[in-house]
């Protein structure tokens, strides 16, 4: 289960990927004029839960740093346009850590 919180609103998703942006065809459409129509996506990889920018005009930021691609960690803050998001997930939703 993936939980995204923005401006006090909570959105829950059972599976990935999740696309976000201004366009209504996104999994999470957001009303923010600074967002691209298809701004970013959350997906699952062997690394964990990954946030990927989809070549947006204004970029995707994690913890204040522009991040075209970022493996999310608990407590990370995501900024897209002027929208701040927190992303939480059930540890079982992410793949196990890689063995070295």
Predicted feature residues:
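Forkhead-associated
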Residues: 3, 7-84
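Regulatory inter-domain linker segments that are low-complexity and enriched
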Residues: 1-2, 83-100
